[in-house]
């Protein structure tokens, strides 16, 4: 395979959940930039319409629909729509959509637990099941989960969130082993603190930001594009022998205690 083809996504199809903001938005644009056709979803219809219009103006090949990934019925509908748009073949699945609740362990409710498991773990597991026939039909499939460095270090207030991401990391390894026979690779990206709408309150709190940055060898928080570039690489032919891995994009946060 030529160098150009090894570093291209030309002609591929991708589903990116939660693609209207933050890391998901950056991944959508990164994949399109390397030649992929992308389908995305958001539970916020207004945000989705705004993004789709912006991408249309830029002549990006992106389509999408409203979907709350915590709903099994809506996930099934999403898979049907993706299959219809891409004629039953999908090369790339990016499980990015997720949720976050920050509380001390004794402050969590049963509803908090159910919500986080549904949106962070069950949704990814089920979407992999739904996408499997399409990924297999494409001949070369790549699944990328957006996990978190919180699954590798203990951070107060993150107990349930971190547990769901730890489960995602193990799911990654199981999928990699079971679906290699179908030429489907699975990897996880574990970001540290990234500048996204979901971390705005953290970034605004200068003391909290300073404390976090002090633990990062690079001395700053990350940008969504720094996660998106790895996501794109993991889906390329260049990464064809990489599977079952959890890769931190955290400026060295997890190696610094």
From Swiss-Prot:
Top-level taxon in the UniProt lineage: Eukaryota
Pfam families cross-referenced by the UniProt entry: adh_short_C2
Source species of the chain: Narcissus pseudonarcissus
EC number: 1.1.1.-
Name of the gene: NR
Positions bound to NADP(+): 20-23, 42-43, 68-69, 96-98, 161, 165, 194-199
The protein's name in its UniProt record: Noroxomaritidine/norcraugsodine reductase
Keyword list, A-Z: Alkaloid metabolism, NADP, Nucleotide-binding, Oxidoreductase
PANTHER family, per database record: NADP-DEPENDENT MANNITOL DEHYDROGENASE, TROPINONE REDUCTASE
Notes on temperature effects: Optimum temperature is 35 degrees Celsius.
Its biological purpose: In the Amaryllidaceae alkaloids biosynthesic pathway, catalyzes the conversion of noroxomaritidine to oxomaritidine, a precursor of haemanthamine- and crinamine-type alkaloids, promising anticancer agents. Can also, to some extent, catalyze the condensation of 3,4-dihydroxybenzaldehyde (3,4-DHBA) and tyramine to produce norbelladine, and of isovanillin and tyramine to produce 4'-O-methylnorbelladine.
Enzymatic class: oxidoreductase
Family: Belongs to the short-chain dehydrogenases/reductases (SDR) family. SDR65C subfamily.
Reaction catalysis annotation: (10bR,4aS)-noroxomaritidine + NADPH + H(+) = (10bR,4aS)-oxomaritidine + NADP(+); (10bS,4aR)-noroxomaritidine + NADPH + H(+) = (10bS,4aR)-oxomaritidine + NADP(+)
Pathway named in the protein's UniProt entry: Alkaloid biosynthesis
GO biological process entries: alkaloid metabolic process
Lineage of the species this protein comes from: Eukaryota, Viridiplantae, Streptophyta, Embryophyta, Tracheophyta
Residues at the catalytic site: 161
pH dependence comment: Optimum pH is 6.
Residues engaged in binding substrate: 100, 149
GO MF annotation: an example: nucleotide binding
Tissues where this protein is expressed: Mostly expressed in stems, and, to a lower extent, in bulbs, roots and flowers.
Record InterPro entries: NAD(P)-bd_dom_sf, Sc_DH/Rdtase_CS, SDR_fam, TR
PROSITE patterns documented for this protein: ADH_SHORT
């Amino acid at each position: 395979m030529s160098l150009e083809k090894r570093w291209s996504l030309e002609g591929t199809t991708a589903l990116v959940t939660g693609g209207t903001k933050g890391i998901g938005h950056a991944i959508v644009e990164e994949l399109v930039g390397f030649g992929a056709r992308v389908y995305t979803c958001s539970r916020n219809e207004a945000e989705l319409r705004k993004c789709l219009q912006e991408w249309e103006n830029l002549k990006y090949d992106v389509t999408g629909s409203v979907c709350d990934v915590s709903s099994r019925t809506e996930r099934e509908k999403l898979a049907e729509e993706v299959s219809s748009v891409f004629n039953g073949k999908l090369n790339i699945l990016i499980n990015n959509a997720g949720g976050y609740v920050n509380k001390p362990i004794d402050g969590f409710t049963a509803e908090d637990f159910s919500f986080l498991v549904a949106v962070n773990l069950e949704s990814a597991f089920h979407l992999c099941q739904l996408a499997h026939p399409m990924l297999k039909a494409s001949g070369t499939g790549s699944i990328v989960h957006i996990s978190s460095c919180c699954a590798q270090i203990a951070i107060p207030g993150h107990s349930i969130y971190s547990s769901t991401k730890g489960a995602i990391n193990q799911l990654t390894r199981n999928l990699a082993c079971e679906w290699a026979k179908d030429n489907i690779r699975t990897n996880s990206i574990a970001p540290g603190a990234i500048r996204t709408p979901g971390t705005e309150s953290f970034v605004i709190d200068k003391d909290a930001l300073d404390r976090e940055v002090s633990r990062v060898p690079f001395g700053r928080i990350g940008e969504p594009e720094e996660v998106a570039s790895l996501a794109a690489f993991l889906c390329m032919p260049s990464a064809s022998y990489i599977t079952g891995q959890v890769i931190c994009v955290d400026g060295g946060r997890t190696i610094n205690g």
